[in-house]
Amino acid sequence: EAIAQSSGVNAEAAGYLAQVKARANMEGKDVSTIASELQRLGKQAFIEECWKERLREFPLEMKIWDDCVRTGKFPQISATNKGEVQFVDLIGAKNGSGATFKATDLYWPIPVNEIQRNPNLTQNEGYSAK
């Protein structure tokens, strides 16, 4: 993803992703075939393919939230089309429990000692100021 973000979709970026995809290759394709297919993708489609692969590779690693915050996108997995994922804007998206993400969900609490040192600071919404 980083290579594609900075240099566009090229052989290096496609090669790395192809190696990962080839390990669980269900279609019997070799790395060079997968890399060739990936190189034909546009930049955004390639980046989203990287995100999809992270979802498949690290489902229980709790990495998804960091990716959502970093990209501003949330993966919506289709309930009807197996394996289909769409990336929608994080703010306004609904999670699996039906809660809607708000901008304030992206804030961390301000440490209490910082608030004590600076009375002009107020705690971020959703956190109690002690």
For each predicted feature, which ranges?
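Boundary/linker segments of alpha-helical solenoid repeat arrays
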Residues: 27-31
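C-terminal substrate/ligand-recognition segments
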Residues: 1-20
